[in-house]
Amino acid sequence: MITSIPLLLSVLWVPILSWINFSSTFFLFGIYYGFLTTLPIGPSQLLSIRAFLLEGNFSGIAAVSGLITGQLLIFLSIFYSPLYVLLIKPHLLTLLVLPYILFYWYKIKDLIDYQSLKPITSIKDTRISKIFFDSFIFQLFNPVVLPSPVLARLLNIFLFRYSNNFIFLLSSFLGWCFGQFLFVSLGKLLLFRIESDSPILYLLVKRIIYRTFSIIILSFSLLHLSRAPVPFITKKLNDNLQFNLSKPEDSFVLTKSWPTLFFDYRKWNRPLRYIENSRFSSQSPIKKKVSQYFFNISLSDGKPRLSFTYLPSLYYFEKNLQKSSINFNLFSSNEIYEKWIKNKKNKKLKIYKEFKNRFKFLDNGFFLAEIIEKKNILSTFEGNIFTKICDPLLIKQYDKKMIVSKSPWLLTEKSYKLTKTQKTLTFSKKDNKLKKWISNQCQEFEDKNFILPWEPLTQDARRILSLLINKSKKTKIDTNLKQMNFFDENATQLLNKQNLSSIENTRKKINRKSNLNWELILNLSPRQKILFLNYLQKDKWNTLKISWKNFFLGDFTQIKNILFLLTKIIKPDQNYQFQEINKEIPRWTSKLKNDKFDVIAIGVTDIRQRKVKNLGYLIKGKDKRRKIIRRFSQQSDFRRKLVKGSMRARRRKTLIWKIFQVKINSPFFLRIMDKPNLNVNNVLKIKPTFQNILEKKKKESLNQKALFIKRTKADRFAIANRWDFPLAQWGRSWLLLIQSHLRKYILLPILIIFKNVIRLFLFQIPEWNQDWYEWNKEIHIRCTYDGTEVSEKELPEQWLRDGLQIKIIYPFYLKPWHNIQNRNNLPNKKNEKLDLIYDDTNFLQNLVKTKEHSNNLVKKKKLNYCYLTAWGFQTNLPFGNIKKQPSFWKPIKKKLKKNMFFKPYQNLKNISTKNKLYKISDVENLKNFNSKKKEYINPNLNNLDFKKKNVVITKLNNQNTLLKQNTDNDIFSINFEYKTSIYINNLENLLKKKHISIEKYLKKQKTLNLKKKLIMIKQKTIKILKKNVQLIKKLPKNLKINIQKIYINLKINKTKLINNISKFFQDN
């Protein structure tokens, strides 16, 4: 006997624990998903927080209670389908959400008086009912602001799935209550903190809160506009209205039903892509229709389970049989289920035994080829094997299936054969008992609404079928350019070319048979079937109209026909329930205009292709046809072949999260884009020596980059991509045009005038003609964004949107003077060439110089051009490296240096040599004038001596050549007869005194060249030694770093080994 409370609890604890262990998964899942429903923040949550902050605890609890009742009503709608259709289906509520939010915002946008900010203290206050009603309605609308409506919908799915599990329902309710309690307590805490921490009066704080919440609700309404489909009349619908103004019967208001009048699921609101059908075959990989989710109880392993893919045709068939009050006692259901379960178990046992025996045979030593099951295959006489799908011996074990036009679930018999005997249909000997029983029972129906497949067609149906077939024969029906919408009531459009083959088959059957049944209609394609039924229904409407007219005219015999037709038309769903329920995929069955290029402002295509930029025109052939050259934009493709009119904001994989976003990325890869920075010091813990080396290397690399950065092809493309959006192209193209006009007509003319005026002031000849000639040669050509030339005066098409480049041919560079060589100075050039030939040492060098001179002349003939940048610089290629311009002041500096330093020094040298020569010549002239007078008289000797003089002088070095030129000018001023011989003799004496000969001079030059080579070799060796010394100095530091790395890696490996060993022992 239990005498105390602890003993009672200990006794009860054991069954409670066993119950929790048994239902722990459902209990935990219920609490988790119940709590998740309170996380998504909607307008009702915002209203309750506003009520807590502005009107106190009492109004906040009223708002939360409205929120809770609204959410409870949504949960109850899962178990009651009419309430679910009203609340969860978005057709009606979508129209009401936005007007109500805007009305509420208009109501609270301005603070009229401060009495509305006073806290509520009693239930009698009228504001409580308003707050409760607002939060209740907003919760029924079920819009979610943050983070996503998925969390709210998860519980709905699980409640529907586990509605029979009491533990899940109870735990989810507990989790939901806990979440609501937490929300209320957090609201109270927020109110308390704001009241206590506010430095000013709380009434003024309330005014700020009032204003902020009105802004939040307005922003929420705008966000709802972007998410929900707006029921506006589109452009295409307007065109249809204008086209059908003359036809009042086909107006869209009368024909379209709710909710497709406002929300047509076939419109391109969703960002769906258009996929064309194959041009060569009628079979398309795209599904034309999908089966709707249909929920009903079905059997799985002999047990009743909820199936979401139950066949609707079976459900309606069962429903009609139940309505007819027939006792279906043909077979007892329990016997069928028991037999089915037994067969399944026997099959499992057989398979298990078969595998067990095979394993035993393998253990006993049999080969695998002997144990594997062997099958017979059909083959031709030639030895060719049939495919598995065509082989009757293997077709049962083949996974694939043949395409069958009929639905296997319709009540049509495949085994019977139709034979024609005196215009009647007879079945074969194999009778279908189920079919006979159903037909006998259906004949006893009072109201025969359910049509069976083997029943014959009525006269009206046969007439309409023949009319349709004759119409398709006369006019080949084509609906490639029209939109099909069969779920609207105006689906009376023509058939596609693809369905003509089935119409031909039906025509042949009509010709063969006189008695037609509904099976022929079942074999038609879905479009033809719906078209036939719509025509049949329209025919009934027309006969009803005619009968009404006759009735009003006085023919009272039409009353029976009117009543009969009205009963048939009012109940259209019960007429033809033999067809399966399916849903057409929301896509256009018609053929849209899908071209490769989407030219803006023309509207050729119905699909948004990738952006195309016009490059220009290319003239080809004798006819000189203009071919448009195009290119795709370098930007990422934000369009992705979407149909015009679709909502791009609802795309899944193309997220836009930046103001200026160059590339398009999926949100899944955003974490890869934002790479975290790695701190090397925290990971490796390196000493400051290593840090100093890294800092030095960074500084050196930065300095090298700052000197001159060469742009590669990839860099140029990257810069072009950055500029390739409309606003940037607009600004850049205007800047380029301004820069070209400034350069051509303002800057360069000013510089030319300034230069020539200064030359006049310096008493130099101005170079107007040369400068203006070079300025006129400069041509500015307008090009497209990629650099293809368009014209000198005309701009390319859409240059503000697509971009612009300006190419400068023969760019003008200002020169301090022009080096114009006189072509009349030919003898000087000839003498120079003779001198070069006589000099054996410099002969090869001079040949190289002549070749370089000829190459330069060829290069000058090539076209000189550059591209202008937006800042006035010049580049060799679009977005390439900035071109270095020749300096104006550099040649002036060189000239000044020569005039200031080199010329005075050379003049002094020349004067000293002249003085020496004059002294020597005067003395020797006095001594040898009388003795060698006879020699001077003979002119032939003088000519020979003069030639010798020239030969000797050319073989001297550069300094002696200068002396020769200066002395020749002085000596030739004296009489030729007397002074030439004196000059030659003087030179010979000088050479004898100094012992200078030509051979010695050549030897000296060779030695000098050898010395230069030796010096070069020494310099290279010194550089190599310096590098080796630096490497030797850095060796200890590098060794330290490598040792530290090895030490760290060893530590990491040790920790990994210890963890692995500990895990191994824990597992064991």
UniProtKB/Swiss-Prot annotation:
<keyword id="KW-0472">Membrane</keyword>
<dbReference type="InterPro" id="IPR008896">
    <property type="entry name" value="TIC214"/>
</dbReference>
<dbReference type="GO" id="GO:0015031">
    <property type="term" value="P:protein transport"/>
</dbReference>
<keyword id="KW-1133">Transmembrane helix</keyword>
<comment type="similarity">
    <text>Belongs to the TIC214 family.</text>
</comment>
<keyword id="KW-0653">Protein transport</keyword>
<keyword id="KW-0813">Transport</keyword>
<feature type="transmembrane region" description="Helical">
    <location>
        <begin position="68"/>
        <end position="88"/>
    </location>
</feature>
<feature type="transmembrane region" description="Helical">
    <location>
        <begin position="92"/>
        <end position="112"/>
    </location>
</feature>
<keyword id="KW-0934">Plastid</keyword>
<keyword id="KW-1001">Plastid inner membrane</keyword>
<feature type="transmembrane region" description="Helical">
    <location>
        <begin position="11"/>
        <end position="31"/>
    </location>
</feature>
<dbReference type="GO" id="GO:0009706">
    <property type="term" value="C:chloroplast inner membrane"/>
</dbReference>
<protein>
    <recommendedName>
        <fullName>Putative protein TIC 214 N-terminal part</fullName>
    </recommendedName>
</protein>
<keyword id="KW-0150">Chloroplast</keyword>
<feature type="transmembrane region" description="Helical">
    <location>
        <begin position="213"/>
        <end position="233"/>
    </location>
</feature>
<feature type="transmembrane region" description="Helical">
    <location>
        <begin position="131"/>
        <end position="151"/>
    </location>
</feature>
<comment type="function">
    <text>Involved in protein precursor import into chloroplasts. May be part of an intermediate translocation complex acting as a protein-conducting channel at the inner envelope.</text>
</comment>
<keyword id="KW-0812">Transmembrane</keyword>
<comment type="subunit">
    <text>Part of the Tic complex.</text>
</comment>
<feature type="transmembrane region" description="Helical">
    <location>
        <begin position="166"/>
        <end position="186"/>
    </location>
</feature>
<dbReference type="Pfam" id="PF05758">
    <property type="entry name" value="Ycf1"/>
</dbReference>
